[in-house]
Amino acid sequence: MKRAFILVLDSFGIGAAADAEQFGDVGSDTLGHIADQCEQGLANNDKREGALRLPNLSKLGLAMAHKESTGRFAPGLDADAEIIGAYGHAAELSSGKDTPSGHWEIAGVPVLFDWGYFTDKANSFPKELTDRILERAGLDGFLGNCHASGTQVLDDLGEEHMKTGKPIFYTSADSVFQIACHEETFGLDRLLELCQIAREELEDYNIGRVIARPFVGAGKGQFERTGNRRDLSVEPPSATVLQKLVEEKQGDVVSIGKIADIYANCGITKKVKATGIPALFEATLEQIKEAGDNTIVFTNFVDFDSAYGHRRDVAGYAAALEYFDGRINEVLEIMEEDDVLILTADHGCDPTWPGTDHTREHIPVIVYGKRVPAGSLGRRDSFADIGQTLATYFGTSPMDYGKNFL
């Protein structure tokens, strides 16, 4: 029975890529810099303190993968752990350092075109675009129209939004159009309808995602995003390994978290909603136990990125990694003879880096299975090596990009 479990630690980069200079990210290192801050006692909170401890991930090969990527061991990680997994680091072929590009490339389809971006920090959106969105939605105005941190924009504009009913439109360095609205005063269904309108109107702008950002709360300092985020992505430009598994092998792909949104539902046969790392982990375990032959269980742990990376919360990121490390053996314990587990990421988001954006980094490629030889996979030239490996494993037609590493 062939089953693969892909766990994406969203934003968990392990060292700057060779082309990081093109992105202003030379020297970025999500894992390494978190470990440095922990070692220096600068990443303590009510959930953790001291050096970064990831004993189980180190056994799987994380510390060695980071060493091969950067030339140094991350402090606190066990450099002498007995390795039970195959480990490597992968560079990105895709032109961007965004979520869809990373995930599509993982599934064998790198993004070799340039996304559209809204580059102006203020007055970011063309008037003709916002006019069409407002007209179709029956709205008389909007707030924002700028680059913004998703949490700061709520403090800045949330109360005015509640008073006026005007949605908050904002963007970032990514190819995104984000809409924040209060779940109770504006309405979740109404927000999702507005996002669908925006998705349609953005077709000519080549924008990767429209993101619904619902929130709740009574006023400034009390606003919180809810778990009802939706990402409306364009479809991948060619068939991913997910689609090939479903179409060629009549297999199943179980999406946990925002995976289905990222792939615009292409190649997804089941969607499981869960919010927060503990709930995502529980859902993953449940779906692994239920999975049949020719199945991929695919989970995105978005909080590493959204709650800690973008918010530059080093202690929060470290605590989340240690929580994940403390539970990963639960997956190993229920794996069957031919199963394959892949731990990876889609980009970096170094919480010590200036700004709030992603960082261009290598991603870890950590593979475990009872039939998978332990040892180094070395440097992989593309995230698409993961997709090609899955294509080989499941016996689908080969992908156009990537090399099998098993």
UniProtKB/Swiss-Prot annotation:
Its cofactor is Mn(2+). SUPFAM superfamilies: Alkaline phosphatase-like, DeoB insert domain-like. GO terms for cellular component: cytosol. Its main location: cytoplasm. Its EC number is 5.4.2.7. The keyword Transferase does not apply. This is Phosphopentomutase. Mn(2+) 1 binds at residues 10, 346-347. InterPro entries: Alkaline_phosphatase_core_sf, DeoB, Metalloenzyme, Phosphopentomutase_DeoB_cap_sf. The lineage of its organism: Bacteria, Pseudomonadati, Pseudomonadota, Gammaproteobacteria, Vibrionales. The keyword Disulfide bond does not apply. One of its GO terms (molecular function) is magnesium ion binding. Belongs to the phosphopentomutase family. Gene3D superfamilies: Alkaline Phosphatase, subunit A, Phosphopentomutase. Mn(2+) 2 binds at residues 305, 310, 358. Keywords: Cytoplasm, Isomerase, Manganese, Metal-binding. Isomerase that catalyzes the conversion of deoxy-ribose 1-phosphate (dRib-1-P) and ribose 1-phosphate (Rib-1-P) to deoxy-ribose 5-phosphate (dRib-5-P) and ribose 5-phosphate (Rib-5-P), respectively. It catalyses: 2-deoxy-alpha-D-ribose 1-phosphate = 2-deoxy-D-ribose 5-phosphate; alpha-D-ribose 1-phosphate = D-ribose 5-phosphate. It is an enzyme of class 5 (isomerase). It comes from Vibrio campbellii (strain ATCC BAA-1116). One of its GO terms (biological process) is 5-phosphoribose 1-diphosphate biosynthetic process. It comes from the Bacteria. Binds 2 manganese ions.
